[in-house]
Amino acid sequence: MKKRVLILCTGNSARSQMAEGLWRHEAGGRFDVFSAGTKPTKVRPEAIAVMKELGIDISGHRLKSVDEFLGQEFDYVITVCDHANEICPVFPGKTQRLHWPFEDPTDEASFRQIRDQIRARIHSFVA
């Protein structure tokens, strides 16, 4: 049975979207991975662009609110920003909650930097 992972940030616009795409790419289908936001906005074009550089297309990802996942069981709930960590809801079952804080990217260079940091973290986790 696949492990279920939910990645949370505030806007579900950059860090969590990149993490979802990277996790799916790195894990080769061994996990069911979702991302969501506490206050979803829109996927940032910079996130789409820097992921495309790696051959990962997140342009079809839709924004999701954490509310869509309340009551579901996950093996891991990972927050990637401090705000999401502070207000992360409780999920049923034996969910392991992890906090991987990443800075909010502001320009294309910082999007690449954060993407690479997230990728390294995921790679070491799923290896």
Language model feature labels by segment:
Residues 61, 67-92:
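Mid-chain, well-packed structural core segment of small domains
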Residues 85-127:
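Phosphate-binding/catalytic loops
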Residues 2-67:
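Conserved active-site segments centered on acidic
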Residues 19, 59, 67-70, 92, ...:
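Generic, ordered loop/turn and secondary-structure boundary motif
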Residues 12, 51, 77-78, 118:
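Conserved small-residue
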Residues 28-29, 73, 93-96:
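Short glycine/proline-enriched coil/turn segments at helix->beta-strand junctions
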Residues 2-5, 69-80, 111, 120, ...:
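Cytosolic catalytic domains that perform sulfur/thiol-centered chemistry
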